[in-house]
UniProtKB/Swiss-Prot annotation:
Its main location: cytoplasm. This is Exodeoxyribonuclease 7 large subunit. Its EC number is 3.1.11.6. InterPro entries: Exonuc_VII_L, Exonuc_VII_lsu_C, OB-fold_nuc-bd_dom. Keywords: Cytoplasm, Exonuclease, Hydrolase, Nuclease. The keyword Hydrolase applies. It is an enzyme of class 3 (hydrolase). The keyword Nuclease applies. One of its GO terms (biological process) is DNA catabolic process. Heterooligomer composed of large and small subunits. It is found in: Cytoplasm.
Amino acid sequence: MSLRSCSTEMIPEFTVTEITDLVRQVMHDTFYCIKIRGEISGLSRPSSGHVYLSLKDDNSVISAVCWHGTRLDVQFENGLEVICTGHISTYQSRYQLVIEGMVLAGQGKLAAMLEERRKKLEKEGLFDQARKKPLPLLPLKIGVITSPTGAVIRDILNRVKHRFPSHIIVWPVQVQGSQASAMVVQAILGFNNLEEPPDVIIVARGGGSIEDLWPFNDEELARTAAASKIPIVSAIGHETDFTIIDYAADVRAPTPTAAVEIVLPERQQLVSDIAHKLSKIRSAVRNVLGAKEHRLLQLYGVLTETKHKISEVGRSALAHQEKIEFLFKVALLKKQQYLDNLIGRIDRYNKEHIISVGYAVIYDNTGQHVSSANAVAPDDTIVIEWKDGKRRAAILT
């Protein structure tokens, strides 16, 4: 009906407040429980704890709010396509969806979003093997981040008990819903900040749908796990389930119980392995000692033989020394005799010897020895020396 087809008297009149209340009532009565599919955008989390966001499709946008304390199975994240359950309310002449429940929609888009995130973090080097920390051989203290209730924690504790009893510290968290990823992040940081931190951390939850496991695809959680100083083992879902934290963790276990088997050795097997290795060590030591003993005996034999040879050489050297000394004395005696003969011969030609036996020595006027008659001439003066004195004489002819 158009305004022209009715008289103004037939049109009801409302105040602003009345029409606002009427629209609010109509909205509430008509859309008191609805589902809206859309993509999350404009996400805001003020300190009040409420969550404000928009849901959009290709053509339209609607505001939405989730009041603090509302428990949801899915974590808010920009870009997620979701189906929200709730009611329409009006606020300051605007309408909005009050979210009371939410599930993920469009798993194909979720898978594409997950792969895009994985490639982004992989490109940053967050998953590089060089960043991975080795697990301790036998952790004395194990931190477990999981729900404090349910089968997972019971399975873990039971497996630890039967495998190798260790000190377990459980950090209780939600493993599903909008608060799950933030709680796991705080748990990892909390373990790292303890004065006596655990030797290894297991992050675990049971299997579930992609929506149930989605908190473990959170980017902040992946970065926190990669930055942990304590080695982290992820055990999320079943063997076929893969989440982002599996790539960021140091080790991925297919199940929570498998995580315990990776972290802890089986006690009896460990004892058996140690005994076997000790046996091998003892055998190796015996072999080494036997070889060394054999070598020492060889060296002792060589040393004894060498000692005998040295003794023989010593005796031979002593004999040679005595022979050399004897030959040296004989040679020295011969040389002494030769020298004595030589001295005797020299003495026979000595002036004093010649004079002493009655001969005389003649000198010319210059004092030179005259050994020939031709060395002097008539009228030359000469000196004649006998053993008892000298006399001058003249050559007459």
